[in-house]
Structure formats: C-alpha cells, structure tokens
Amino acid sequence: MEVKATTILAVRRDGKTAVGGDGQVTLGSSVIKHTARKIRKLYKGQVIVGFAGSAADGLALMERLEAKLEEYRGNLLKASVQLAKDWRMDKYLRRLEALLLAVDREHMLLISGNGDIIEPDEPVLAIGSGGDYARAAALALYRNTDLSAREIVEKSLKIASEICIYTNDKFVIEEI
C-alpha cells in the first residue's frame, strides 16, 4: 500500500526561520495517525529538517544528514551536498522515497534523491502533497503582509490543510 502524507513549509523573515509540518499519516484511503512529528532540530538545535514521503525513509535520511552535519561541523550546505551524492550513488539509498527540507540561519534547502539541492529565490520553501498550496499561500503573505515567519507558516499550513486531503491541522512548528 502506498503511504501518502505531509506538508512541510519553511519561511525566513527578519532573521528568524520557522519550519512547520502537519501531523497526518495516511495509509491507502485511511488516516492512521493525526499527530506524527515530521520535523526535527539537528546539530545542537542549529538546523531544522522536515521530510515528506515514506516515514521510515525520511527518518533514515534525517539520521544520515545528522551524521554529515557532525562530520562537517554543522555546515549545512556541505553536509547536504555529501548526502545528495551518497543518496544518488548508493544502491540502497537510491530506493528511499522521501524529500528533505533543511534550514539553518543562512540556507534553506530542498534535498532530493535525484541529487538535487535547491535553494529558493525567495525565503519560502515547501515540500509534500500540500506543499504547492502552502507555498502559494506563504508567498502571498510574505509579499503582502508584515507577518512574522511563524505566523506565515501557521496561516499557510492552515490553508493547505483545507485543500489537501493528505494534510491536517495538527501542526508542529520549530524556529531558529
């Protein structure tokens, strides 16, 4: 059975970055969990990572990113590049089905199994089934209001939860 889930959104404004995710996990046509935690702080609280896709795969990739962060002393960009290289070249890792969104004080990155590391033009990034809805809402709020990063994440995730059937309104939000 295919496991679908998640909207993860990151917004940076005025030196603060907020990353939020919903808590829904869907198996087939049933919601099996409402309060899953899909974002974590890594490397002494200096990096926030969220995942979309298979939970086991996402957690495995988070662990590997954490090891790379330790190896590269918290340098998110270098750790992400090395993770993406490993992910693309390793026969086992290539089968993992997840996307990572990782942020620190300087960078906001989408990391994929294709070897992609994408940093957005504007300080708004989203992944997952409701990611496009959350990103559109966040960009509108970012461009047209003075809301904080956290407020933009909250309001945008709420909008995504009203549109995407794989996204609920049980949010976890972390800030750095």
From Swiss-Prot:
Source species of the chain: Aquifex aeolicus (strain VF5)
Matching HAMAP family: HslV
Alphabetical UniProt keywords: Allosteric enzyme, Cytoplasm, Hydrolase, Metal-binding, Protease, Sodium, Threonine protease
Ways its activity is controlled: Allosterically activated by HslU binding.
Cellular component GO terms, alphabetical: cytoplasm; HslUV protease complex; proteasome core complex
Subunit structure: A double ring-shaped homohexamer of HslV is capped on each side by a ring-shaped HslU homohexamer. The assembly of the HslU/HslV complex is dependent on binding of ATP.
Gene Ontology MF: a single term: metal ion binding
Gene designation per UniProt: hslV
Domain of life assignment: Bacteria
Active-site positions on this chain: 6
Residues annotated to bind Na(+): 161, 164, 167
Catalytic activity entry: ATP-dependent cleavage of peptide bonds with broad specificity
Function description: Protease subunit of a proteasome-like degradation complex believed to be a general protein degrading machinery.
Protein's name in the database: ATP-dependent protease subunit HslV
Subcellular location: Cytoplasm
Annotated GO biological process: proteolysis involved in protein catabolic process
EC number, UniProt record: 3.4.25.2
